[in-house]
Amino acid sequence: MRPFQSLLLLVCSALLGSCANSRFTTTPPAWAFWKPNRFDRHGRETGRWRTYYDDQKKQPYTAGRYRHGRPVQTFRYYDPTGKPDRSETYRQDGYCEVSYWHPGGQLARRGPAQWVTGPGKAPRFYWYGTWTSYEPNGQISAVQIYADGTLTRAETYKDGQLTEVEVFEHNWRSRVETYSNGQLLKVETFEKGLRVGTTSTL
């Protein structure tokens, strides 16, 4: 075989190999980055994500974004009729503010939560801090306080007035205070959910 024929064969082989390898490249084309519901090379959700109640993708269920398998910015959830059900606005380190909505679009409940995930960690989503519930007219109906996902205190309101306070210890109700027109009427104490004492304040 002549030298120039050997060189030509070598060049052709290189070109064919390059074309073959380009079909199996790990880098997707630029347009693929705009497609929703993608995974990165580690199998983690990334970019825009959309899920639906139906196979025809006419009834949205969730809409949001992921980065390295963690939700970022604002995730929105919808009920089967298409109305907003709740939203989760994420900040750094998995902290987020969660809002629930009445069917009419008014704020129903809001409070902080945290999404914990990472290497060697089981994914966990829990509430903490103060959660406030509202009537459709905007009046407060309840205030609950959570510590690491566990309810520690619950306040109930009627027409904007405090009516009851419940205190919890180790997932057991330990104390109940009853109010009327802002005045404390009665205090009940509990041990492991069983009432052990009642005190009237009148």
Name the predicted role of every residue range.
Residues 1-8:
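Bacterial N-terminal signal peptides that target proteins for export
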Residues 8-15:
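Bacterial N-terminal signal peptides
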